[in-house]
Structures are given as C-alpha cells and as structure tokens.
C-alpha cells in the first residue's frame, strides 16, 4: 500500500469467478503466505486449496490434491494448521448438483498435531506443568531490578512476528475430520486454543449454530435458525461474532452463551436507482465473464443502450426482471436470465381449487368449474358449479 506497486501472486488461469463474491483467500499470520481456493485437479466447480507465497515469486503448493470440492480455508492455531470445508465424505446427488460437507483440519506442524490430539486428562497435566514453569520464571524475574525488567518488557513489545515454517511433506498424515457428521455447511470457526469448533449446519429446516467440544467429545445445538452467515473471532479468542440474516450475535466461548447485539442502521431506499445499478452491473458481468470473448458476435454495447431506455418507465421489479431476461436472451446462450420473487410477510391464503366465471358481473365469485380432488370436492360439500361465493371470513366480495 505504501509503494502503490501491484504484483501478481496467483495467475488468473487458476481462478474462475462464476458469481459475485465467490473468490476466497486468507493472509497468513506472518503476512507472507496466502491460502486460496483455486482450480487444479477437480476443475472450476471442484476447487482445491493452494498455499501461495505472497512475494509474487509464484511458489505454490496444492495442499488438498483432491477431485472433490475443497474450499473456505482458514488459518488456525497461529498458522500451524488450517481448517477447510470438503464434500469428500458427504452424501451427494450423482444425477444433479449438491453435496454435504464436513470441516477438516490439516497440520503444518508436528508438535501442534500432537498437542491437538491430547485427551482431556493429558491436557490438564500439560497445563499444570506450564503453570508451575511460568510461576518459577515469574519468581526469578521478580528478583531482578526494575530497570532490567523494564528493558525486558520493551524487548518483548518489539519482538517481531516469527516467520511460519511448514512441514508439508507429512501434511497428508496430519488430516483430521472435525465434524461428527456431514451436512449442508455454512461458516466455521476453531477457537484459539483448538478445543472447540463452532459451525453453521443445516439438517432440517435452515441453518443452526452448533458447538463441538473436542476435549469433552460433545456436540450440542446453540442457536436454531441462524440462517448460515459468517463468523469472526475477536483478537483475544474470547468471543465469536455471528453475522446472519441482518442480525449480529456474540458467542462467549468460555461458557457457550449467546447474546444478541442491538444496532440501528438507516438507508435511503431508492428502487429506481437500485434497478439502474443492477442493470449496468449485469451488462458488465456479461462483458467480463461470458465464455466467448466476442459475445457471439453481437453488438453488446448497442443492446445495452437499447434496453437502458426502458429503465425510466419501469416501476416494479417484476417488469425489471422481464426486461433483463429479454436483454440476456439476445446472447442466445444457455443459463441466462433474471427472475424476481418478492419476500411476502403476509399469511398465505387458501386456494379453493376452482375456476371462476370471468363474465359474471355481480357481487361475489361465481364458480364455473371445480378442480378434481381439490378442497371443494369433499363428500359433504354443498358447493357446485354455478354457486356464488358471497363472503370470505364474513367479508363481502364486491
């Protein structure tokens, strides 16, 4: 940022953007490496995880080497391991799309791997030994004069971040599946100590927030219906923040308590301007991403200008979606189009299963035909073709 120089870390041939926001990468704790979802063995729709050096040298290692989908890699345990999502063990639709995922962990450090696998009792003994050692060192430090102690604090504050060292040759022997069963997964976070995994998973209706405790070997449901979302741990590793469905929640790691975070935000809703932006964004997406650089030889700029003229005359998203579909149809390509479904907050109304006489001009609804096996075909019904429905729930139909 200071020099304003730009360098290529990973060649574009390894990346393919199908939709907005589908590219994932994360900086290492020492700011010298990236974990990136990229195209390798499995093609653009079955990504792998690559470790890439940030200096632009091109040094890279395919960490997963899988024909399955491996994605959403995150550094954990101070860069000594990564967690990621993979569908290698999940149920899948072989005749179509979709598969269940699990969260896995890969260790780049043998000592971190051994420590992670300690039992609750082994960890307690190790913590006790560390406490005794820290106490002895503290007693020794207290005997030193204040000046030397201050110098030591200054040295500690100025201590640079240790560069990460990777034992990649043995990485495949240090892979563990962290989730107890496959599911449709959202985001996941491993705590700083590596003792708990928080993840969003959908088993029934929508995503729920789950916690797995590795030392207790327990899995429990924390929040129902969180709707997927994204999770972020704080710097101290004491809390996790969940952003989902327009809501914020704080999860206290120590006691697994969840609290909502209240906030207020206002924005100026300008639907006409919003549609104008979406129109131009769609046009640019085609220009940037259509498989044929020549766009089938059509004058795409001309079509953009031609359809743009309709924008001032459109006052709803249904007509807007139709207009977008018409413009995209000029491509004569598959899998193109636009649709709009409004989010309804009103209760669903019942369908009686009847066709009505459109030529009837009186009050109410005159039934012309009753659909077979519908609600009006019950044995005890008195409703027949020719009947007029005058009221619904006591309200007159005019």
Q: Model-found features: residue ranges?
A:
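A flexible loop/linker signature enriched in serine peptidases of the S9 family
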Residues: 1-3, 8-20, 29-32, 37-50, ...
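Conserved blade-ending motifs and adjacent loop-strand segments that build the rim/top face
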Residues: 23, 60-74, 176-186, 218-233
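Blade-terminus and WD-like Trp-Asp/Gly-His loop motifs, strongest in beta-propeller folds
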Residues: 25-34, 73-81, 188-195, 230-237
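Terminal targeting/pro-maturation regions of precursor/exported proteins
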Residues: 93, 262-326, 330-331, 361, ...
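Conserved PDZ fold ligand-binding element
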Residues: 378-398
